């Protein structure tokens, strides 16, 4: 269970890093928002899911 928790935390950190870098780049590009809206929403949905997964796994660890 600890390995699953560590992988979930790593995935959350990696997704957070990608969103922090990627979303401003998408919004700054000339046609960024209209062409990459689905990718931004998918990344945000993945991030929210990972937050809940880490919280659930944390309740089993501690």
Curated annotation (Swiss-Prot):
Cite the entry's keywords alphabetically.
Answer: Chloroplast, Membrane, Photosynthesis, Photosystem II, Plastid, Reaction center, Thylakoid, Transmembrane, Transmembrane helix
Q: What is the documented function of this protein?
A: May control the interaction of photosystem II (PSII) cores with the light-harvesting antenna, regulates electron flow through the 2 photosystem reaction centers. PSII is a light-driven water plastoquinone oxidoreductase, using light energy to abstract electrons from H(2)O, generating a proton gradient subsequently used for ATP formation.
Transmembrane region(s): 8-28, 41-61
| Family matches, as Pfam families | Ycf9
- Location within or outside the cell: Plastid, Chloroplast thylakoid membrane
The organism that produces this protein has a lineage beginning with: Eukaryota, Viridiplantae, Streptophyta, Embryophyta, Anthocerotophyta
Query: Which organism does this record belong to?
Result: Anthoceros angustus
Q: Which biological process annotations from GO are given for this protein?
A: photosynthesis; photosystem II stabilization
Protein name as it appears in the record: Photosystem II reaction center protein Z
Q: Name one GO cellular component term.
A: chloroplast thylakoid membrane
Q: What family does the database annotate?
A: Belongs to the PsbZ family.
Which NCBIfam families does the UniProt entry name for this protein? PS_II_psbZ
Complex and partners: PSII is composed of 1 copy each of membrane proteins PsbA, PsbB, PsbC, PsbD, PsbE, PsbF, PsbH, PsbI, PsbJ, PsbK, PsbL, PsbM, PsbT, PsbY, PsbZ, Psb30/Ycf12, at least 3 peripheral proteins of the oxygen-evolving complex and a large number of cofactors. It forms dimeric complexes.
Which portions of this protein are annotated as coiled-coil regions? none
Q: Which HAMAP family match?
A: PSII_PsbZ (MF_00644)
> What gene name is given for the protein in this entry?
psbZ
């Amino acid at each position: 269970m600890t390995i699953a928790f560590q992988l979930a935390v790593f995935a959350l950190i990696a997704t957070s890093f990608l969103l922090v870098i990627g979303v401003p780049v998408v919004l700054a590009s000339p046609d960024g928002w209209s062409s990459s809206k689905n990718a931004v929403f998918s990344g945000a949905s993945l991030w929210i899911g990972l937050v809940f997964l880490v919280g659930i796994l944390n309740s089993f660890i501690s």
